[in-house]
Amino acid sequence: MIIDIHSHCYKNPLPFVTPFCNPEELIKFNDKEGIDKAVLLPVVNSEIYFPQSNDEILEICAAYPDRFIPYCNIDPRAMTNSSNAPLHKVLEYYKNKGCKGIGEVMPNMELMDPKVQNLFRAAEEVGLPLVYDGSDVKDGDFGLYDDPGLSQLEHTLQRFPKLKIFGHGPVFWAELFRLQTPGERGYIWNFDGSDQVGVRGEESVVEGVVPILLRRYENLHCDLSDSTPLQALSRNMEYTKKFFIEFQDRLYFGTDMCNKYVDFPHVRFIKQLLTDGVITKEIYDKVTHKNAIKLLGL
């Protein structure tokens, strides 16, 4: 069994930014890949994609209850655009409607912004896990900004010890190994939005901040979706083996399906780790579905 902890779709995708799947297209993709169920994360922040409602996600999941699991989401600026907005009321409302988590949170704000911290506080109060995407710039991007070394994430983990926070995306996974320069944390594009600018140097294999944070804070979990964890975990298979052994109970398979025309090698990657003996069958089962079943109460 495979559960995708991080996926997206729209009932009626718009022809802008990226070609998302509709529900039927996502089911077809999942069938091809051997994915049994997928968590659907509503996009509510307008920094890059067009916002969708939590109710759209609930309607999709109600139509295909055996294939999709709903999350809810809310922009931290919603309701009163302040650090005391009663966001917990919204989260409680959608939790009662069946939503199993929160995300993908990705406004281009600082992680320690009081309004963002208010959202995390509400998530902890309601008792739902939260996944966010990060950024290494404070404007012109999507995702919560953090400093090199992920100090804002660490302070958030300290402040909300009962909140399960999922690390995800380039800024998080760039720090699996020690950075050579802060610019390695993210991607910068040409003004026309085409090719990526710059060339990265030799890849480090010295342990970075992420495993240190995982050892310090049991409320930090890892979302293995998008290409960045696959790239990082392909650098040194000896280290990858140790990483999966040590953190096997907090790693979750995911794809971050947000372009129906792109190849997603995630199932092949995790199966190859099993075939090559990098991970055991027990770890494979945990990462592909057992951890998600436990987390979401399925």
Predicted regions: what they are:
Residues 14-17, 51-53, 116, 142-144, ...:
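Short aromatic-enriched loop/helix-cap "lid" or pocket-rim segments at secondary-structure transitions
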Residues 36-37, 45-148:
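Active-site gating/metal-coordination segments in enzymes
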Residues 3-7, 38-40, 69-72, 102-104, ...:
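Hydrophobic faces of well-ordered beta-strands that scaffold small-molecule active sites
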Residues 1-19, 53-83, 210, 218-221:
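Mobile, glycine- and charge-enriched loop segments
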Residues 113-253:
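Catalytic pocket-lining loop regions of alpha/beta-barrel enzymes
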